[in-house]
Swiss-Prot record:
Belongs to the acyl carrier protein (ACP) family. GO terms for molecular function: acyl binding; acyl carrier activity. 4'-phosphopantetheine is transferred from CoA to a specific serine of apo-ACP by AcpS. This modification is essential for activity because fatty acids are bound in thioester linkage to the sulfhydryl of the prosthetic group. Pathway: Lipid metabolism; fatty acid biosynthesis. GO terms for cellular component: cytosol; membrane. Residues 1-76 form the Carrier domain. This is Acyl carrier protein. It comes from Nitratidesulfovibrio vulgaris (strain DSM 19637 / Miyazaki F).
Length: 76
């Protein structure tokens, strides 16, 4: 499974959205309806899935699906 597929699955599981809604340009808050707790849970799920630690400053910059993909790929 690719990074994109893993991140899409995490987003679908955490936010209860469909695969069609998880587009690279989708904003977690504006397009996918996430609140601050959802964002924290998404970051924690990504940390667990990819075995990395995302510091708070970086986490605040992950606003869209493509931001998460780029961040994870950069950390691997």
């Amino acid at each position: 499974m690719s990074v994109e597929e893993k991140i899409s699955k995490i987003i679908m599981d955490q936010l209860g959205v469909s695969a069609e809604e998880v587009k690279p340009e989708a904003s977690f808050v504006e397009d996918l309806g996430a609140d601050s707790l959802d964002l924290t849970e998404l970051i924690m799920a990504m940390e667990e899935e990819f075995g990395i630690e995302i510091d708070d400053d970086d986490a605040q910059k992950i606003l869209k699906v493509q931001d998460a993909i780029a961040y994870i790929k950069n950390k691997q």
